[in-house]
Structures are given as C-alpha cells and as structure tokens.
Amino acid sequence: GTPGLRVGLPEVNLGIIPGAGGTQRAPRLGGMRLALDMITSGRHVPAQEALDAGLIDEIREGEPREIALAAAREALEGRIETRRTGEIAVERDEPALSEYREKMAKQASLLFSPHKCVDAVEGATKPIAEGMAHERALYRECQESPQRAGLVHAFFAERAVAKFPEQDAEPREIKKIGVIGGGTMGSGIATA
C-alpha cells in the first residue's frame, strides 16, 4: 500500500456483511479483535495500522499504479513471498466475541447486519471453505433484509444531496412579480 492508504470493510453501513472472504481473511491476517472492530463498525484503518496488524505486507512511496505494476512484476518473478490466508489458523477469541456481541446488542440492537458480522467473523475459526460457505449464507440473509434496501437508499440519497446540477446556471432577471392573496402572508411578500 501507499502511505495514504486506508483499509476498511464498510459493508455494514449498507446493511450487509463483507463478501468474497472479507470476514474470513481479515481475522486470519489481523486477528479476530481487529476484524470484529473493523467489520462491525465499518471503520477504516490507516496504512501504518494495517501494516502493524498484518493486513497489508508493506507500504511503498510513489504513484499507486506504478507501485502495483512493480509489485505484480516482483510477484511474477518470485521475489515476493505470498501468504495463503486460507491456511492461516484463527484462534477463537471468546472474550472478543462476547464483547462484540454485547456491544452490538447495546449499540445496534435494531440493526440486522452488525450481528451477522460477528457471526461471520466467528466462522473464521473453521477451515476456510466452511467459513466462506458460512459467510455466503449470512450475506444472503442480509441481502434479503429490508434494512439493506433502506440503508442503500440512504447511502445514495446522502450523496445526491451534495450534487447541485444547476450550480453553474445563470439566474434570470426578474422583471415582474405577482402576489396572489392579500392576507398576512400575501401582504408580507408584497412589502418585501
């Protein structure tokens, strides 16, 4: 990664859990407690924290595209040692699991996906194929939840508010104005 890199699994904010092995690889690389923190909160960690935790292998300075190409060349030439995350065992961290189940019960009692995130991370104590199947089943449950649809709608609505399509439009000159009604509001508008 680059120094400005931020690593995260923010899917919980959309009412789902990370897919494609995110809930299985994060605990294998960074430990169960960090995975629970990141996955249940959607928190992104800075590059140095990700490196210290083992989520990434190194931090390189430079242009991201050039860094990626150089890393790909080094991997093809066998100069980078790859980690097979599926072969890394995860010890069950019962205190962390209990803490996060309790935390989700207090902070997210009415939300569906944070609880499923804890269940999915717990599945990382199984062999990778079983953990991935468990993740997939939990992902499907979240996908079918009406909360997911609402959170996705809210996500896009928040972004749409920041867009002003008429931002560069030139205002037209007002030449005439008419006020209908002579009550309190109408007379107030007319005098303004």
Segments and roles (model prediction):
Residues P10, S41, A53, E61, ...:
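Generic beta-strand/beta-sheet core signal
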Residues G1-I39, A53, A68-A71:
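CoA-thioester-processing core
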Residues R140, P146-Q147:
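Terminal amphipathic alpha-helical/low-complexity segments used for targeting or macromolecular assembly
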Residues R33-L138, F156-A157, V161-E170:
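Amphipathic alpha-helical segments at domain termini/boundaries
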